[in-house]
């Protein structure tokens, strides 16, 4: 299988500390770059299970790796990771898990998927097209306050109220069904003095995260990773914006710090921490950013399970 070299590839491979006979999970197959790297480092007795809720990604995996007995792909969100691991009898035996959060480059580049404000296409944004609600159906029926809340909570968009009002005004004229239409609405609503990057960036991010339950699924997945890992197993999480990274950071802090009240008479050495952070936050090198500008906002956190 030929695969593109994904973001922070070398750092992830080092962070997973891959054992030739180990069991690994790639929770976000995408186009297989990380999975391919793991398989290259596994021996004949090693195993890799990949997951992806995008049927296009599953089709790529089945075509490229169907002959590799060490590999299996599950068409499922990583929010159901523990069940998929349990079905294989691997619970508590997994040596490494990778989560590469967010939208993939192929999804962004395919105008028909509706993720990009720079390519006109149907306003869809579903990672799993079998999911019932797409971006257009939501944006044309949601209350203005609900739109404002989504733009603020998931995009940290300062002008959420203005944009939400502009969306409601525009859809009264005709339904919003194309990515270009939504992008134009946001551009017109944005104060010109504030334009430093494309005005629709945060709006598209927020709607995509909401439609696909991205933060909810990450929140559900992280405790499952802890339960499925073997002691000494590694978890690597790549995030691309502060909302995701904040969620991951708080989970790691909760499972790795002393968080009992000071008045409780227990010594720190007697508290069993479940996770140990390995190093600090990892960012891509300037050389990687030059080759792949999308890598600029990537952040990698690596932890090891202690108990």
From Swiss-Prot:
Please name the GO terms that the record assigns under molecular function.
Answer: rRNA (cytosine-N4-)-methyltransferase activity
An annotated GO cellular component: cytoplasm
Instruction: Give the enzyme's main class according to its UniProt record, as a single word.
Output: transferase
The record's listing under Gene3D superfamilies reads:
Putative methyltransferase TM0872, insert domain, Vaccinia Virus protein VP39
Sorted alphabetically, which SUPFAM superfamilies does this protein's record hold?
A: Putative methyltransferase TM0872, insert domain, S-adenosyl-L-methionine-dependent methyltransferases
Query: Where is this protein chiefly located?
Result: cytoplasm
Q: Binding positions for S-adenosyl-L-methionine?
A: 32-34, 52, 78, 100, 107
This protein's source sits in the domain of life called: Bacteria
- EC number of this enzyme: 2.1.1.199
Protein role: Specifically methylates the N4 position of cytidine in position 1402 (C1402) of 16S rRNA.
Q: What is this protein called?
A: Ribosomal RNA small subunit methyltransferase H
Originating species:
Coxiella burnetii (strain RSA 493 / Nine Mile phase I)
Primary gene name: rsmH
């Amino acid at each position: 299988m030929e695969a593109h070299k994904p973001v922070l590839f070398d750092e992830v491979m080092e962070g997973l500390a891959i054992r030739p006979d180990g069991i690994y999970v790639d929770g976000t197959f995408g186009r297989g770059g990380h999975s391919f790297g793991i398989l290259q480092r596994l021996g004949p007795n090693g195993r890799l299970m990949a997951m992806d809720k995008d049927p296009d990604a599953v089709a790529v995996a089945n075509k490229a790796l169907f002959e590799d007995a060490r590999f299996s792909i599950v068409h499922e969100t990583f929010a159901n990771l523990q069940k998929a691991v349990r079905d294989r009898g691997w619970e508590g035996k997994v040596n490494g898990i990778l989560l590469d959060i967010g939208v993939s480059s192929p999804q962004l580049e395919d105008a028909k998927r509706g993720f990009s404000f720079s390519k006109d296409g149907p306003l869809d944004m579903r990672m799993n097209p079998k999911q019932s609600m797409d971006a257009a159906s939501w944006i044309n029926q949601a209350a203005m306050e609900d739109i404002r809340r989504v733009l603020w909570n998931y995009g940290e968009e300062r002008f959420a109220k203005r944009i939400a009002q502009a969306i409601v005004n525009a859809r009264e004229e005709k339904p919003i069904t194309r990515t270009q239409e939504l992008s134009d609405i946001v551009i017109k609503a944005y104060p010109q003095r504030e334009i430093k990057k494309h005005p629709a960036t945060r709006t598209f991010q927020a709607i995509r995260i909401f439609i696909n339950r991205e933060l909810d699924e990450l929140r559900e997945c992280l405790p499952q990773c802890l339960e499925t890992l073997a002691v000494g197993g590694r978890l690597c999480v790549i995030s691309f914006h502060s909302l995701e990274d904040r969620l991951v950071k708080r989970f790691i802090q909760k499972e790795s710090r002393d968080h009992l009240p000071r008045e409780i008479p227990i010594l720190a050495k007697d508290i069993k921490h479940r996770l140990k952070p390995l190093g600090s936050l990892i960012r891509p090198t300037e050389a990687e950013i030059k080759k792949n500008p999308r890598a600029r906002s990537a952040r990698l956190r690596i932890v090891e399970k202690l108990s």
